């Protein structure tokens, strides 16, 4: 007897919260189920939270998502391709279901945490003496002196 392997994407026929079936004009068109859409696929924590049916492979260097380039890719709006100043402070992700409080909290908290992390890293680098661009020769000599200790 032949065995059939079915991926998570093939099992998921809908991604919308209404539970509607695939439209009749597109039979066999499969969509991955997503809790939300991340602003950046480089944000691994967000991708792990949002994409429900991805198999995660633990490689020696890092944990990598397997199967992100699935059989279906939805069209993206021009707003995503050409961001304006109004979208600079966007959320970490956008929830598929606006009533999903856990998702909404994750996306909102993620935005605040990422900006706090950026500010903290900048302050840490300043305290370590790595940012001497505005302080001049005195800063550079202090940095060289700290490196000799």
Curated annotation (Swiss-Prot):
Predominantly, its location class is: secreted
Q: Which Pfam families match?
A: Endothelin
Q: Which residues form the propeptide?
A: 1-33, 57-149
For this record, the Gene Ontology CC terms, alphabetical, are: extracellular space
Q: Which PROSITE patterns match?
A: ENDOTHELIN
Keyword Hydrolase tagged: no
Q: Which GO terms describe its biological process?
A: endothelin receptor signaling pathway; intracellular calcium ion homeostasis; positive regulation of protein localization to nucleus; regulation of systemic arterial blood pressure by endothelin; regulation of vasoconstriction; vein smooth muscle contraction
UniProt source species: Cavia porcellus (Guinea pig)
- Keyword field: Cleavage on pair of basic residues, Disulfide bond, Secreted, Vasoactive, Vasoconstrictor
The name of this protein is Endothelin-1
**GO terms assigned for molecular function:** endothelin A receptor binding; endothelin B receptor binding; hormone activity
